[in-house]
């Protein structure tokens, strides 16, 4: 059966127990299938919303400008389309599109400069970190550092003119999930570092952008299957596990 992807907005109740006045900001068309939903939402410093969509395991939509699947979308807070989006004036293109050629974005974060970063699942290998720029094409499924699960090649290889390269890729894949960028006094040596959870190898990756995105793997029995990561204003780092309560790195 077809399944839809919704982005909703609501208000937290005064007692902090529920969301009220829910309304739909964006709804993607229903697609048959059960995977590659994407569905991360982050707010830029200027108030615009970035929404991620997966390719819904259909390959072609990620490069189809008339489709919203496999894209990063940019909306105003009320769900309307900003007039300065890159493809607003392009005939046949969905005006919400900010970037294209994505497979399945599972994490998104904004750094101190307002730059959007995402991580996304490859197929067998080829999980990526991408610095998302206005109007850019990130290649899926034309280029990839992964292969199909049967070992066959994907698309044309790893590079093509006019398509962006990832800042970092993992092979074997690590199944990236939650994404946060560090600020705050606690763990001040980590200022500006990127934190990404792994659903596959049970660790949190700390990436240092000042050192070529060198990776340190923070691992314990309690970091298994990390889904979400948050950095508080004081710099403390918390994460959620799929089956355990929220944990904090101390």
Model-derived regions: residue spans:
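Asp-box/WD-like beta-propeller blade repeats and closely related beta-sheet repeat scaffolds
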Residues: 7-42
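Hydrophobic, well-ordered secondary-structure segments
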Residues: 19-23, 35-38, 46-52, 65-69
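Beta-propeller domain segments
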Residues: 50, 55-216, 224
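Short, small-residue-biased leader/transition segments that mark boundaries at the very start
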Residues: 2-6, 241-246, 250
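Generic C-terminus detector
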Residues: 225, 231-242
